[in-house]
Each structure stands twice: as C-alpha cells, then as structure tokens.
C-alpha cells in the first residue's frame, strides 16, 4: 500500500516459468532479484513437482532473459543447501549436502546460476540466508504459526524433540543485506547472510507463549518429519568484512515486534483456512 502510489512501483501477477512474460518484464529493468520460490519443506516432501518447476525451471526462464538483455541477476538462496551441520558454520565454499526436495531444488538453482556466469558471462550473484521472521510471513512458517495458534488457544505441533537449531534473522536485516550485495557485491560471488543467533525450536515457542501470556501446555510434540535436519549454521564474515553489513535487530526485540504486528493485523489472516496449520502434509 505504501508503494502503490509510486511511479517506480508496478505489480504484475504471473509465473516465472512463463518465459514470454518474463521476457517482457526484464527488458526494461536494471536488475533482477529473484525471491520467487516454493519454500515450505513440508510441502516439498508431500509433492516435489511444484518445487522443481518454480525453483529450477523458473530460474532457467529468468536466466535466459538475463542473458538475452545483459541484466544483473541476484538469486536468493538458503542455508539449507549445506544440509545439517554437527559443528562449525558453513562458509561460502562449503560443499552442498541438501536433505529435502526443497533444498535440492535451491542447490540446483545455484549451480544453474553459476553456470550462466561462467559459460555466458552473465552478471550474477547469490545470497544465502538463515531462517527469516517478521511481519507478513506466511503462517505455514514456524513463528507466525505459533503466534496464530496460541492466540486461538490451539495446540502447537512440534516435530520430534523440538531441539532442532536454526539461526534466526529479522526480515529487515535480511533485506538490507540483499540491498548491500546488489549495490556492492562482486559478480560471480556468493554471500552468506546470518545473525549468529542460534535458537532451538522449542525455546522459541516457549518464548512466544511467555510473551503472549499463554501456557506451555499448548505445546504438542508430534512425530518428526522425514529427513529433518538438526542444525543449520552459516558464517557471514565475508559479507560483514567486505561490504560492512551487520544485523541491527536482536531476537528479543524482533520477536516482540513480530508478535505485536500479527496481533494488531487480524484482517491479514481472515481468509486463512485450517489446512494452513496442518503439520503433516505428507501423511
């Protein structure tokens, strides 16, 4: 809504696999930043086909047009391409070890992007980020799902022991990192984006419940999902040292802001179905 009145903003609803549409849109732009993706791991386990279509075929469509019109291209990727790490944090040169169909499609997209840089000389950059949270996140993701279920005093499903570790970053910090890379990043390079804020799932859930004044009895441990990675962690020293980026929002501040936003914007979720909150779509 804030952008809708700007002559620099235009919303086009379409599919990145539509090469004809993508061609028309890219011809007049300065750069392409590809956020478009199927991203929910649970759904990739239930049906991987939409993930292959969006995350690989869609990237191919974008790259073909980027090559044709010689545009700058930034691919948004994920820490999940590195798989689960028992210790240490993945640098940009760590080997890929994706565990889920989702992660495999994102790793495939990265290799496709790199191939267009090497083979055709395309101006490409890749960023990988850890778990995002903040306002307007789709409620199939952990943090908004917990907030919305807790608000209704409904049970909150937690996979396995709930001790899986993720590094959490507030969405504003992620966006600022992307902007920094788009402006000053080196062509052909990749940059990890992380906040060094590892927290296990059940600790996050209990923190949210505490802030909302809800009981931990809402937590319901359920069967773990297939191939559930235990720990993701990335080293973002390259981004910090070369481009001077640092995250600004700590988790306590960010999670309170996030809870406040969801509770203050009930109209945003009025059309959500109960299916959004199902926890085992592969069964």
Which residues does each PLM region occupy?
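Hydrophobic alpha-helix immediately C-terminal to the catalytic Tyr-X-X-X-Lys motif of short-chain
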Residues: 108, 112, 116, 146, ...
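Structural element of the ATP-grasp superfamily
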Residues: 62, 113, 146, 239-240
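The catalytic Tyr-centered alpha-helix of NAD(P)H-dependent dehydrogenases
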Residues: 94, 98-105, 135, 139-143, ...
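Short, glycine/charged-enriched secondary-structure capping and boundary segments
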Residues: 1-2, 25-27, 46-50, 87-91, ...
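Residue-level recognition of oxygen-bearing side chains
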Residues: 21, 31, 50, 57, ...
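N-terminal Rossmann-like NAD(P)+-binding domain of SDR-like oxidoreductases, especially those catalyzing
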Residues: 1-132, 257, 262-265, 274-283
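Proline-centered turn/helix-capping motifs that create local helix->coil transitions or kinks
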Residues: 74, 83-86, 121, 137, ...
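C-terminal substrate-binding subdomain of Rossmann-fold SDR/epimerase-dehydratase oxidoreductases
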Residues: 10, 14, 144, 150-283
């Amino acid at each position: 809504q804030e952008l809708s009145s700007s002559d620099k903003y235009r919303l086009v609803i379409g599919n990145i696999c539509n090469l004809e549409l993508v061609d028309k849109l890219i011809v007049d732009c300065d750069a392409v930043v590809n956020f478009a993706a199927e991203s929910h791991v649970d759904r990739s386990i239930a049906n991987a086909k939409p993930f292959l279509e969006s995350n690989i075929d869609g990237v191919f469509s974008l790259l073909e047009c980027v090559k044709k019109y010689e545009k700058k291209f930034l691919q948004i990727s994920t820490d999940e391409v590195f798989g689960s790490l028992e210790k240490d944090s993945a640098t940009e040169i760590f080997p890929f070890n994706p565990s889920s169909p989702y992660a495999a499609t994102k790793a495939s997209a990265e290799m496709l992007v790199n191939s267009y840089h090497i083979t055709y000389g395309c101006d490409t950059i890749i960023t990988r980020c850890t778990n995002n949270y903040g306002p307007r996140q789709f409620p199939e993701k952990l943090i908004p799902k917990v907030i919305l279920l807790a608000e209704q005093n409904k049970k909150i499903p937690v996979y396995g022991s709930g001790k899986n570790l993720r590094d959490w970053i507030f969405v504003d910090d992620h966006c600022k990192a992307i902007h920094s890379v788009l402006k000053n990043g080196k062509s052909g390079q990749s940059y990890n984006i992380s906040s060094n804020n590892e927290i296990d799932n059940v600790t996050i859930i209990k923190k949210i419940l505490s802030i909302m004044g809800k009981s931990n009895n809402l937590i319901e441990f359920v069967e773990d999902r297939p191939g559930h990675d235990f720990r993701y962690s990335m080293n973002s020293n390259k981004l910090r040292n070369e481009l001077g980026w640092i995250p600004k929002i700590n988790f306590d501040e960010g999670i309170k802001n996030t809870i406040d936003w969801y509770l203050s914007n009930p109209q945003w979720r009025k059309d959500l179905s109960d299916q959004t909150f199902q926890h085992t779509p592969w069964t």
